[in-house]
Amino acid sequence: VGAGIEMISLKPRTQSSWEEKTFDPTTNGTISIPHTYKVDERITTLSYEAHVKYTNKNWFIGAKSVLGSNLTQASGLGGFGIKHIDNKTKEQEYTPIRFSSSWLNVVYGQKWKPGIFVGYAKNLGTSDELVSEKLYGTGTNLDKLVTAGAELTYNVPHWKFGVEYTLSSAWYGKLDK
């Protein structure tokens, strides 16, 4: 039995650049004025996990549940979006995309070991309203994911042979306001 907490703090960018279009009376046309500001942007998130494992001579049972925020650095689902943009400097504030995922793995036997695996992941969205549809991350348009698998392995000292079948289904969503 165990649990963990992960904190990550990222600087998505260090400067903000854009062009402002304005009327030029000398040419009677439109000109672009470039702007660049140094910005001090940061997104800091916390993620939590709990896991259990039981083993004896014939059984292996393992399970894990994660409530994750912006877990892309760990090859997980999630990311972040923009919750505020400063009108003058274009400095941005961010909010994490949160995912919940859980899985269970059960294996029985010694030489011949049948096993099953089931998993579920759900996009919980952001806790703050987004001001832009631009998202940064992995699986940001995923609503939920279900995985189920069965395996059969033959085990001898230093060798393991087996077959496994896994079915995964994904449901995709859209950005809601």
Where are these regions (language model features)?
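Membrane-embedded beta-strands of outer-membrane beta-barrel proteins
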Residues: 48-50, 102-104, 148-150, 161, ...
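Detector for outer-membrane/organellar transmembrane beta-barrel domains
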Residues: 1-141
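Generic structural signal for beta-strand residues in well-ordered domains
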Residues: 107, 152-154
